[in-house]
A protein has these predicted regions:
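A metal-dependent, Asp-based hydrolase signature
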Residues: 1-27
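Charge-rich, low-complexity terminal tails
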Residues: 18-19, 27-34, 150-161
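Asp-based, Mg2+/Mn2+-dependent phosphohydrolase catalytic module
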Residues: 44, 60, 64-161
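Alpha-helical structural context
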Residues: 7-8, 49, 96
Length: 161
């Protein structure tokens, strides 16, 4: 956010804009996370049966802070914060963890960031639609028999165990 403001302001931020941005970032960083109903129950069921990795995008400090404060870190082997969730970064992630594309199963609510790139590299995906999706994340679902759509996150357990 600060980088974008610097670019828009020609490399120098007026003091009032700097403090306004700092206030927004602080509010975002300390905003209480709302864990979707059934997430912890699902993770508890899957833990021990699968290597669970969080793949998220955004600012490293902010995302790791959210991950740690969520109370869900105990269920995961690793948390990967990517600049973009695209084919290149998913391939780097699975190479780092010695996972073949066909062994990768991504569970997520964004077709653009979670589902399509994983399908494009040969993985599988479970789409968990959410009422709120950023406009820049909207895209049509790819045609693939490697995609499952569930209504509730707890439905995942029925497919995987």
């Amino acid at each position: 956010m600060t980088d974008a403001a610097l670019e828009l302001c020609g490399g120098t931020l007026p003091e009032n804009i700097y403090y306004g941005i700092k206030k927004i970032i602080t509010e975002l960083a300390f905003h209480n996370l709302e864990i979707i109903e059934g997430v912890e129950q699902t993770l508890l069921a899957l833990q021990g049966h699968y290597t669970l990795i969080v793949a998220t995008k955004g600012d490293l400090t902010e995302q790791m802070g959210k991950f740690r404060s969520s109370g869900l870190a105990k269920y995961f082997h690793h948390c990967e914060v990517m600049e973009n969730k695209d084919e290149k970064n998913y391939l780097e992630l699975i190479a780092k963890h010695d996972i073949r594309p066909e062994e990768l199963l991504m569970i997520g609510n964004s077709v653009k960031s979670d589902i399509a790139p994983v399908i494009n590299i040969g993985g599988m995906a479970i789409h968990t639609p959410h009422d709120i999706v950023w406009v820049h994340e909207k895209m049509d679902m790819p045609e693939s028999d490697r995609i499952i759509v569930v209504k509730r996150i707890t439905d995942i357990v029925d497919f995987l165990l």
